[in-house]
Amino acid sequence: MMKNPIIGRVWKFGDDIDTDVIIPGKYLRTKDMQIFAAHAMEGIAPEFTKKAKPGDIIVAGENFGCGSSREQAPLAIKHAGIACVVAKSFARIFFRNAINVGLPLMEADIECQEGDEIEVDLLKGEVRVPGKGVFVGNKLPDFLLDILTDGGLVSHRKKAQNEQKE
């Protein structure tokens, strides 16, 4: 279930963060979410999962989630406790996979430092950075917000089916 606004501490990454560094290929044979969580961002920040706290936010540059179209990448981030990903842009397949697994995200070009506490308002399409202002991002369409609110595509479809039965 999506929380809004999302307030959390920033983990900052650059451009072209590919799915191979988000979750290295050697972990793809498992379906154990704890293994995904334990190795999230390992390819670029080996200490990430030891230091990240539930509710933290990843802020990145352009083309976040590029590379192979592995659904495990947003799952690893989500199960590591990351509440949201904000990036200048996302690889399209990562963007949809994140929505489908219920990982909130927003395209926005914001100024912040690692460790800053920021507020992401998905409903308004804004990111508030104390001392730097409010940055306007790309607000998600309502149908994608509905999927996130329901916890991902599978939960969203189950909810719709249950409503049809009533």
Curated annotation (Swiss-Prot):
One of its GO terms (biological process) is coenzyme B biosynthetic process. It catalyses: (2R)-homocitrate = (2R,3S)-homoisocitrate; (2R)-homocitrate = cis-homoaconitate + H2O; (2R,3S)-homoisocitrate = cis-homoaconitate + H2O; cis-(homo)2aconitate + H2O = (2R,3S)-iso(homo)2citrate. The record marks 29 as: Critical for substrate specificity. Pathway: Organic acid metabolism; 2-oxosuberate biosynthesis. Its EC number is 4.2.1.114. Gene3D superfamilies: Aconitase, domain 4 (3.20.19.10). A motif (YLRT) lies at residues 27-30. GO terms for molecular function: homoaconitate hydratase activity. InterPro entries: Aconitase/3IPM_dehydase_swvl, AconitaseA/IPMdHydase_ssu_swvl, IPMI_Swivel, LeuD, LeuD_type2/HacB/DmdB. It comes from the Archaea. Keywords: Lyase. CDD domains: IPMI_Swivel. Belongs to the LeuD family. LeuD type 2 subfamily. HAMAP family: LeuD_type2. Component of a hydro-lyase with broad substrate specificity for cis-unsaturated tricarboxylic acids. Catalyzes both the reversible dehydration of (R)-homocitrate ((R)-2-hydroxybutane-1,2,4-tricarboxylate) to produce cis-homoaconitate ((Z)-but-1-ene-1,2,4-tricarboxylate), and its hydration to homoisocitrate ((1R,2S)-1-hydroxybutane-1,2,4-tricarboxylate). Is also able to hydrate the analogous longer chain substrates cis-homo(2)-aconitate, cis-homo(3)-aconitate. These reactions are part of the biosynthesis pathway of coenzyme B. Heterotetramer of 2 HacA and 2 HacB proteins. This is Methanogen homoaconitase small subunit 1.
